[in-house]
């Protein structure tokens, strides 16, 4: 069974993927010290430095997972080459698990390990950075679960890409504006909408680290986690029943 795992690994991380990806993830943390002011991290600046698209490491990690899911696994489904893999001596559930580990979990581990070592090196492990890491983790697995679901459901690279980016973009943008409005009105509905875009709440939390805002962030992480798990098992059922 390990031989099949090696085949899948080489397919997804053949040269020069790792040689390019790992240095970019490491260099991406240059944006964090770029927000230094008077030799110290301003909390709100640290939050801005961790927002996806600004934080290059997070963006590259997510992009790699998207590429693996849609343009490797999804491509096999689109052109029918998945049949050759399913004819190997491996159960569908194990094949799905191997693919998920390589497509989603491994890029996340690259980010998590490098980010943790970086924060330890600059002595910045605190409640704010832990909150940022938890929020990104929950959002990452929710987002990749959405992409995986669309990839297996639509079985078209173009349609999966458009559906995934439209869904995630809409959630992130609407959630950003919505959460900002709810913060201003001090509404308890933040507990339900915080999962859509936690960064306005984290930014507000960096200015005023109150327990109420922290509770909203925790609620968002829990909702993201629940949705990610639900979509994961839904995708597993779709893959298990898929006819090739």
Question: What function would you assign to each model-found segment?
Answer:
Residues 1-23, 241-244:
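Aromatic- and glycine-rich beta-strand/loop motifs that create alpha-glucan
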Residues 21-28, 159-171, 189-195:
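Central hydrophobic cores of alpha-helical transmembrane segments
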Residues 35-48, 172-241:
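Terminal transmembrane helical anchor/hairpin motif
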Residues 40-43, 116-139:
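Membrane-interfacial helix-loop-helix connectors in multipass membrane proteins
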Residues 49-75:
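Long, hydrophobic alpha-helical segments
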Residues 71-105:
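Helix-loop-helix units of permease transmembrane domains in multi-pass membrane transporters
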Residues 92-126:
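Hydrophobic alpha-helical transmembrane segments that constitute the membrane-spanning cores
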Residues 135-179:
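A structural motif at transmembrane helix-loop-helix junctions in multipass membrane proteins
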């Amino acid at each position: 069974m390990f031989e099949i795992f090696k085949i899948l690994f080489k397919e997804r991380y053949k040269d020069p993927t790792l040689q390019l990806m790992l240095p970019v993830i490491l260099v991406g943390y240059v944006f964090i010290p770029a927000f230094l002011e008077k030799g110290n991290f301003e909390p709100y600046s640290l939050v801005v430095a961790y927002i996806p698209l600004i934080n290059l490491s997070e963006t590259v990690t997510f992009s790699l997972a998207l590429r693996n899911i849609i343009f490797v696994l999804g491509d096999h489904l689109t052109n029918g080459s998945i049949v050759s893999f399913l004819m190997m001596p491996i159960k569908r559930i194990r094949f799905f698990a191997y693919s998920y580990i390589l497509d989603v979990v491994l890029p996340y581990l690259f980010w998590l390990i490098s980010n943790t070592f970086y924060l330890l090196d600059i002595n910045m492990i605190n409640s704010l950075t832990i909150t940022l890491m938890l929020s990104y983790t929950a959002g990452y697995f929710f987002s990749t679960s959405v992409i995986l679901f669309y990839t297996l459901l639509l079985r078209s690279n173009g349609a999966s890409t458009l559906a995934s980016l439209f869904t995630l973009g809409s959630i992130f943008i609407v959630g950003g504006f919505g959460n900002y409005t709810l913060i201003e009105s001090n509404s308890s509905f933040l507990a339900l909408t915080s999962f859509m875009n936690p960064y306005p709440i984290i930014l507000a939390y960096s200015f005023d680290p109150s327990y109420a805002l922290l509770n909203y962030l925790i609620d968002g992480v829990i909702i993201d986690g629940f949705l990610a798990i639900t979509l994961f098992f839904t995708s597993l059922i779709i893959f298990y029943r898929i006819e090739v």
